[in-house]
Amino acid sequence: MAKEIILGIDLGTTNSCVAVIENKKPIVLENPEGKRTVPSVVSFNGDEVLVGDAAKRKQITNPNTISSIKRLMGTKEKVTVLNKDYTPEEISAKILTYIKEYAEKKIGAKVNKAVITVPAYFDDAQRQATKNAGIIAGLSVERIINEPTAAALAYGIDKLDKEQKILVFDLGGGTFDVSVLDMADGTFEVLSTSGDNHLGGDDWDQVIINWLLKSIADEFNIDLSKNKMAMQRLKDAAEKAKIELSGINTTTISLPFIAMDSSGQPINFEKELNRATFDNLTKNLIERLKKPVLDAMKESKLSLVDIDQVLMVGGSTRMPAVQNLVKELTGKEPNHSLNPDEVVAIGAAIQGGVLAGEIDDILLLDVTPLTLSIETMGGVATPLIPRNTKIPVSKSQIFSTAADNQPSVDIRIVQGERSLAADNKLLGNFELSGIEPAPRGVPQIEIKFNIDANGIMSVNAKDLKTQKETSITIKDSQGLSQDEIDKMIKEAEENKEKDAKVKHERELVNRADSLINQLEQVSKTENVPQEQKDVFNKQIEDLTNARDAQDYVKLEAEVKKVEDLLTNAAKFAQQAQQQNPDNQNNNKDDVTEATVTDDSTKK
């Protein structure tokens, strides 16, 4: 393991991933469930907070579950959960804390440094918010880098001697980014970026969900859109179907006991979805992928024939229709030799390795995603740092007063591509006072913009005659103070052990309640032998006693024992259904059983 450990974290909208450098090579760290990515989902239940896969299973059934919080980063919006307000930074920090803790267990050492990636289109406020989330989680964020840039690092680590023009096509769960890079002599230079902050694999899932809802409504005359349990199963089935259609031409979506009809009979739904239908349903989404690619190429001043490689990033790039579009647009076979779900975290880890001195001969040149300007006379946005300027960067320009004997100037900093300041995003403003009386246009005011390697900007204004100056560091638009950040860190640390204990106990009770309910349902099934029912009833009694006595050691043992029985119970139910496919009354009690069995297999 490297002497100084710096985590590389892909903090994604839908999923996150973490990697580190070991023996000068990046490795992806598995989460506690043995998976190499973790859902970016946080679920609250009283004092219990779940993160990752456990939270994702509650995404629809528990209204106090937060997902896609990344979309709110850098805004003033807060989410209210159980009568408490949380900032996007606090929710993101819970995800980062979870990642940090399981990474430390895998590494076997404490870690307090990280490189975190963000979409190329994240503005200054969103980048600062991401950094704040890391601080709250107990991480020193050594660098914020663009996701496509990190991907290029990952793909380019073994190709440092080849000069190439690269197009990075990054379609994740919630965002779409395109970057054009020039790679030569160990240097990555970002020539242009483009994208869509509200387009990702989740949109393809939603199309299938809508198709399923309509199919069920047409066949059974029932609307399941307000049925939380059914919607959770539809969401899971849609994602599974999308993934399967990347490898096969037809998949069968089977949803037994999805709901009850108006007469109280269970609804068993099954339907085939083929790739051609799926592609037709999502053709408008495919169409939306074209413009950002063409915009990025135009901005880079290159033609598509100049591109040497197209790098595929994000799990959604596995879809054949997406790959076909890339071939159609670029005339190149896309490179997906690395796992698209992991490549960004790998690149972040490589950047961490560079900062820690473990990897040499790589220089990362990132760019500003939008033009940075100040408002001048007439409300005009006068650019100081154009879009796609390499960072870190420092630029200055001399301005003057707009009126005679003007004693002060108000400096307003905006971000965007519009000509008028009012049409762009106001990042901040401050005043330089004490200017000596003089005719308009005579005083010389130097305005200096400085952007560090993380994309965080500071602005300085100086009267060159009096040498009076003032400055501002652009904070996120929500304006978290250092006191607020410190308070969040303190609260997280003070409640760390308590939260872990409560979480474990609540998980046990929830699992026990679910198992008790399932065994009770199976016991009512006529096809289950009486001796098996007696075993189930004894287990129900043991689970109930341990739960009510709050004997969590015993409860954990009983839960593990019953989960083995649960597998057999599911087999009994399946056999009963196969033997009596038309006997709806006999299967009525299986509605709960089927649902609980699906949940338990995920635990």
From Swiss-Prot:
Phosphoprotein recorded as keyword: yes
UniProt lists compositionally biased (Polar residues) regions at: 594-603
Ranges of biased composition (kind: Low complexity): 573-586
The segments labelled Disordered in the record are 573-603
- In-chain residues carrying the UniProt-annotated modification Phosphothreonine: T175
Report the induction information: By stress conditions e.g. heat shock.
GO MF annotation terms: ATP binding; ATP-dependent protein folding chaperone; unfolded protein binding
Sorted alphabetically, the keyword list is: ATP-binding, Chaperone, Nucleotide-binding, Phosphoprotein, Stress response
Q: Is ATP-binding set as a keyword in this record?
A: yes
**Recorded superkingdom:** Bacteria
Mind telling me which InterPro entries this protein's record contains? Answer: ATPase_NBD, Chaperone_DnaK, Heat_shock_70_CS, HSP70_peptide-bd_sf, Hsp_70_fam
* Transmembrane regions: none
The similarity comment for this entry is:
Belongs to the heat shock protein 70 family.
Q: Which PANTHER family match?
A: HEAT SHOCK PROTEIN 70KDA (PTHR19375)
Q: What is the role of the protein in this entry?
A: Acts as a chaperone.
What name goes with this protein?
A: Chaperone protein DnaK
Source organism: Ureaplasma parvum serovar 3 (strain ATCC 700970)
Q: Which gene encodes it?
A: dnaK
